């Protein structure tokens, strides 16, 4: 795993940040809230101490949504393009791993809330693979 800073950004590039591994955790979350928040079968989130995170641009363009009634669920997004962006959770920053501009060297350690996985989810090792669409 690298310990050099890794840049990341949202889809439109207005929100930019850097993280310095190692991560405290890196996991897939299959809970119904993460499915709704991502529009996918699971979230891929890395966590690291806030001291290992730095906003480079666009922090003022982020908006946080705290789910009413939830003790620990929130999402943040870029107000220009809607991409989920990092946010503070406890003492750590939650980093949607797909925002990182290069391989962090770490791999997800586990899948949590597996019993709630989407009924249509097929683990990747069980699917045909193609390098590009069509």
Model-derived features: positions:
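A short Gly-Trp-Pro
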Residues: 1-134
